[in-house]
Amino acid sequence: MSERPEPLQPALSEVAPAFVEMAHRIVWASVATVDAQGRPRTRILHPIWEWSGDELTGWIATAPTPVKRAHLDANPQVSLAYWDPSHDTCNAECRATWMFDEATRRRVWDLFANGPAPVGYDPAIVPVWADGPTSESFAALRLDPWRLRVFPGTVLIRGEGTVLTWHA
């Protein structure tokens, strides 16, 4: 019996734009972290993604709560899952890095403030961020993906379309 050949992995240059389009359309992601005992915790967050043509980087404007900080100190890997009612889903597995320097926080603030609808929004609407990007309760979380999956709902519902998966 002959072995089936491994399917060719699509290039990041094919998967990343499809991922960004779907993620920015869906907007909200379930983001999972793991504590020091290996127990997962999820929360709903609002990432924004930048595709340079060579590199995909995600950013989350978030409060650096003690729980998030402890989880990411213990294990800096996060899993993001997006879903919409048409069953379009996309996932990103990433290394997360806290960014507390003022230049990065201002840049991420501006990414959201000037981002296209529906992913863009004014971060100043969050009461604890009233002091702007230098607020103690505002941090930038950088996401560097090592795996992406884009799964159009049409694949599930009608058997049409293509699932795209990339990993580093």
Q: Could you describe each region identified by the protein language model?
A:
Residues 27, 43, 76, 136:
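Short beta-strand or tight-loop elements
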Residues 1-29:
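Extreme N-terminal tail/first-helix region
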Residues 23-24, 73-74, 113:
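Alpha-helix boundary recognition
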Residues 48-87:
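A short mixed-secondary-structure module that forms the rim of ligand-binding clefts
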Residues 27, 56, 92-94:
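Structural detector for hydrophobic anchor residues on beta-strands
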Residues 21-36, 78-82:
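A short, Trp-centered hydrophobic/proline-enriched beta-strand micro-motif
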Residues 2-11, 89-168:
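Charged, gly/pro-rich active-site loop segments
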